[in-house]
Amino acid sequence: MSLQTTTQQIFSCAFGYAPTHTVQAPGRVNLIGEHTDYNDGFVLPCAIDYQTVIACAKRSDRQVRTIAVDYDNQQDIFSLDEPIERHPQQLWSDYVRGVVKYLQQRAADLGGVDMVISGNVPQGAGLSSSASLEVAVGSVFRQLYQLPLSSADIALNGQQAENQFVGCHCGIMDQMISALGEKNSAMLLDCRTLDTRAVPMPSDIAVVIINTNFKRNLVGSEYNTRRQQCEAGARFFGQSSLRDVELAEFAEREHELDPLVAKRVRHVLTENARTLEAANVLARGDLARLAVLMAESHASMRDDFEITVPAVDMLVDIVKTSLGERGGVRMTGGGFGGCVVALMPRERVASVKAAVEQHYQAESGLKETFYVCTASAGAGLC
């Protein structure tokens, strides 16, 4: 049964009437551009065909009533006329409440809503299940109450909810691609200006995501350390962010920098350049050049930014050996585990999957999870 049918049926059973709208917002994978977002740089994500779906309808009062199908149909009810606080037990409720809290500050004409939520974005895999939920909830209120908000506003609202209400620090990429993605396209996002450009993806290219299932444990503390090192690098060059540092200037003064900071700066500067080139290369279907750029990105994350782990490097090598020049592969996400992303002709998917099944578990002791995705549309009615 589809998510759409499931949420609609549970809505009718639980609330005693049929939903008027069903909304979806997708998860995402970042094809290239890692740890560039908080340095005001460039990223190249695409939305994927895993999403959060919400069956919904207006209420005549000021209550927001929500059922989370994936959490044993837990319910949450709160009022728009009272201060919106965190839920004492249910973390999923905080994402809903946070989105609604900041929507109220952006648009006065909100009213009550009934919602039933379900999703199939894998949680904990770095595919942005939380951003998908935030954008879906924002889109519900925007649709039902015709709020004068853009898709970018919905994305920024979701980021604010996650940062300030839930308390998880995140950049803007995840919400922007979930809100603004286009079918069969990636999106080049300038994280400083929030300007976007759709990058058409050749129809015969598959987006393959493979979860290493390596348990990440350093990601929080190491993320903060990398961020501080990047800020130190920007200060050294007298800039507010590494976005404004030129590679030539870095090359001239690299020897003056702390060696570790220099490695971090080199990654960000070269990754920005790779991301801009990758957008052009992808649009013209040059998989051979894309493979080189993705390989350089992974090597930079491994050697200069030092955020990969042996299981990730092993999986990348297995896929790379199987693909040759017929596609690219790299780690994606914050690092220290998580997923790798590969772009390849659809006819190569089966042989890559077979190679991974043959070698990865035998060499790492871990069993991968394999997702074959399509670049999908951002949030909207379904």
UniProtKB/Swiss-Prot annotation:
Site features described as Transition state stabilizer, chain residue numbers: R28
GO terms, biological process: galactose metabolic process
Binding-site list for substrate: E34, H35, T36, D37, Y223
GO cellular component terms attached to this protein's record: cytosol
Gene Ontology terms, MF aspect: ATP binding; galactokinase activity; magnesium ion binding
InterPro entries: Galactokinase, Galactokinase_bac, Galactokinase_CS, GalKase_N, GHMP_kinase_C_dom, GHMP_kinase_C_sf, GHMP_kinase_N_dom, GHMP_knse_ATP-bd_CS
Residues the entry annotates as binding ATP: G124, A125, G126, L127, S128, S129, S130
Main localization category: cytoplasm
Record's catalysed reaction(s): alpha-D-galactose + ATP = alpha-D-galactose 1-phosphate + ADP + H(+)
UniProt superkingdom: Bacteria
Pathway info: Carbohydrate metabolism; galactose metabolism
Alphabetical list of Gene3D superfamilies matching this protein: 3.30.230.10, GHMP kinase, C-terminal domain (3.30.70.890)
Alphabetically ordered keywords of this record: ATP-binding, Carbohydrate metabolism, Cytoplasm, Galactose metabolism, Kinase, Magnesium, Metal-binding, Nucleotide-binding, Transferase
Catalytic-site annotation from UniProt: D174 (proton acceptor)
SUPFAM superfamilies: GHMP Kinase, C-terminal domain, Ribosomal protein S5 domain 2-like
Residues the record lists as binding Mg(2+): S130, E162
EC number(s) stated in the UniProt entry for this protein: 2.7.1.6
Subcellular location: Cytoplasm
Classification via Pfam families: GalKase_gal_bdg, GHMP_kinases_C, GHMP_kinases_N
Family: Belongs to the GHMP kinase family. GalK subfamily.
Protein's job: Catalyzes the transfer of the gamma-phosphate of ATP to D-galactose to form alpha-D-galactose-1-phosphate (Gal-1-P).
Record protein name field: Galactokinase
Species in which this protein is naturally found: Erwinia tasmaniensis (strain DSM 17950 / CFBP 7177 / CIP 109463 / NCPPB 4357 / Et1/99)
Classification of source organism: Bacteria, Pseudomonadati, Pseudomonadota, Gammaproteobacteria, Enterobacterales
